[in-house]
Amino acid sequence: MPFEQPLTAAPTSATPFRTSRPLRTGDVAPDNRLRFDGIARYLQDIASDNADAAGFGATDPVWILRRTVIDVHTPAAFPDRLHLSRWYSAYSTRWSNMRVQLTSDKGARIETEGFWINLNSDTGMPTRISDSTLELLATTTDESRLKWKAWLDQAAPAADGLPDAAFPLRSTDLDPLGHVNNAAYLHAVEEHVTARPDLLAAPHRLVIEYRAPITAGEHLALRRRDDDESSTMWFVVNGESRATARMARL
């Protein structure tokens, strides 16, 4: 099944983009574990740094995430210093899989992959990646026919009399497009995964897929279902699932 498929290894014929930074207290839980929303912010930071260093921030400035995969093999904990490596693992003419590996001075290892879509800044629709950026993507992968395939069930299950959990939005949850920021979704995930210490205690995978944006003023509810091996959350607005997240052991 797609959810279980392994992430690609780092390239051997090219050097990934690399950066490092201290693990900050604003990104950790009370037990000093690096939270999922903190991971998301580091992924956003290295994406911006990579775009600036490579120059495609000028030619292809607007990208959105369709999916994020986070594999926590060994969690990071404060205090520590994180080392991030970013490379391109597959692409097509309008989107790309971006891999980021997080390691640390104290032995943390977190592997991630994001499915990024290039948008036209005027229309907000998917658009062709510039030739110069396509050339850059090809430096770390030969896979140039990437297609979208969902890993998670997008439709939320029936309520079945079980209460949803309201998750009020804040103005600080919104990005420049007026959409709920990727990291803010993972604030909601953090609210619920702490109820599954059995999953957090083992190496685990979190996948979140974004179906449609959530905007200011909308009433967001989380619908959660658990089994022995996983926890799944649907982000529901007016009865419609806008995103799905699932966490399970690796």
Can you say where each PLM-predicted feature lies in the sequence?
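HotDog/MaoC-like acyl-thioester-processing domains
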Residues: 2-7, 12-14, 69-153, 210-217, ...
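Acidic/His-leaning functional-site neighborhoods
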Residues: 165-249
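Hot-dog-fold acyl-thioester-processing enzymes
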Residues: 2-66, 113-115, 119-204
